[in-house]
Amino acid sequence: LIFIVSCNSNISSDNYLNIIPTIDVSSEHQEFSNINAQKVEYAYSTKNDKIPITYGFLKNISEGDSESSTIKFEIDDSIDLKSEGYILNIEKENILITAKDQEGLFYAFVTLNQILENAFAQKTSVPILNIKDQPSLDFRPIHLDLKHHTEKQSYYFDLIDHLANLKINGIIVELEDKLKYVSRPEIGSSDSFSIEWWIELSDYAKSRNIIINPLVQGLGHASFILKHEKNIHLRDKPESDWAFNPLNPETYELQFDLYLDAIEATPHGKYLHIGGDEVHLVERDNKTELELNLIWLNKVCEFAEKHERIPIFWDDMPLKHAGVYNPMFDDKISEKEVDEIWNKNEINLMNFIEKFPKNAVYMRWNYQKSDTYGNLKAMDWYSNNELTVMGATAGQTRWTLMPQNQSNIPQIKSFASSSVDKKLDGLLLTLWDDDSPHFELYKRGIAAFAQYSWSGNSLPIKEFKKLFRIKNFGSQFGEDSFAFIDSLEKPVGMWLNMLLSENGWRPGLSKKQNPLESDIIDLPNLDKKGEWSKKHEVRINNAKRSLEISLKVETIINNLIQSESKNLYLLSVFL
């Protein structure tokens, strides 16, 4: 057999296997069947299995008998594949599908539809193929951060369909105040969605093998709760609405009410993400910050277990308190130095190891340096102590109007690869919304996450970008001359702090008493012509370069639009 691997670097713009995530294919020759992509109308199951939800060319397919059906399918849990895996064989006259489970059957039809779409686009019949496909990571969720804004409700249903076609199987939704809490009505914002609406979305997602799980911040990041007058008495510091007092019993009464509403709104969820990051506490009752953090963590993990949810916890604070945090983000430090830090400070963790809840998932987030020795060592520490660890990478970090660093694809690929190597259950793609960029701008990073969490790390990043262009804009647009997203990142990044003074800090502008004086550059003095331009010469040159790049990008996008590209909506967002 000749093996044709779709994640091979020889992938070409006229290839009918332009699929994300990529699949491994074997075929005797590059032969074609007698099957017309537009004439696949009936499917038959030898075991009376039901046709899953379908898309595109298969959207209107119906059940037929054995003779009239082009597709013959069955579920067989004895096949040697992981859950969600499937075998798809395209023969001269028939298409045969054997799936490990219902989820695998759904993904087999998703893959088949993309093959049919590509055959139609290439004006060929359907290629003869033999496919055996399964995920590299079991749990492949994205993060939906609703803290700062929401989209139209219909957008989220469309998003579910988009994610399903990428074989994403989970969402962790950071609800904050975007759930209309029944138990604590003061917390839900004016644009929050009802529990009933969230149930409807959860049902829609579940039918497409996507499980929605809630994230409700607890110990810290609690301003959306503690800003309300009736909850001020629960603050850790009376003057700050950032954190709860973990020793006040009413803290848990309130938090558990929110959890119950969130669980009701996500009836199919397996997890309850409890947050817990970036919080410093007042030491009280002779307890250290680490002890206070673990008191809270144990109480909320016990609650989660009682309500049949697995708690997920951002893990940074215990590692900070123990003194092993910084090496995770330092790629300049040597392995020897990292080991010395751990040898000195690991005792700070081990002194409380019995208080680390065993039912929690410790989410080791690292968005830029996931491949550092320090980060990998921290993940191994959890596993070595029989604690469950899962990574979190990022498709959008913070404070920019579009993702940076090639949509963060190198880091996504790296963390997915190490997660597979360490045989972890999954990986989360965070998508932070601090600047409320348009969600469409996250789509390339999401596609990369789908690629490397399902198919592994064999596809080079350059080839993935080419595949993304082909898949989203058309098979004729794979060449580098049509690439523009990486170029556009540069002017967006430059404008981030273009008008800030040397000591200006953009995220903190809203908290400054007079940011126009303390953080923003001065305006020109008309009585001193030329002085301002000389002082800000570097900024002016950056602005000129930014404009030049933007004009080139605009030309490429307009060329794509005029050349009848697919996905005009995405192009219009970039434009």
In which residue ranges do the predicted regions lie?
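Short amphipathic alpha-helical segment that frequently serves as the phosphate-/nucleotide-binding helix
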Residues: 55, 156-157, 409
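Substrate-binding groove of N-acetylhexosamine-processing glycoside hydrolases
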Residues: 17-33, 49-51, 200-203, 209, ...
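Bacterial N-terminal signal peptides
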Residues: 1-6
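Structural motif
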Residues: 69-71, 94-96, 140-141, 360-361, ...
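Feature activates predominantly on carbohydrate-active enzymes
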Residues: 81-85, 90-305, 312, 390-393, ...
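Acidic, contiguous N-terminal accessory segments
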Residues: 7-103, 107, 111-131, 313-318, ...
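A short, charged/proline- and glycine-enriched loop
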Residues: 34-39, 135-140, 358
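Generic recognition of short, well-ordered alpha-helical segments
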Residues: 53, 110, 154-155, 373-377
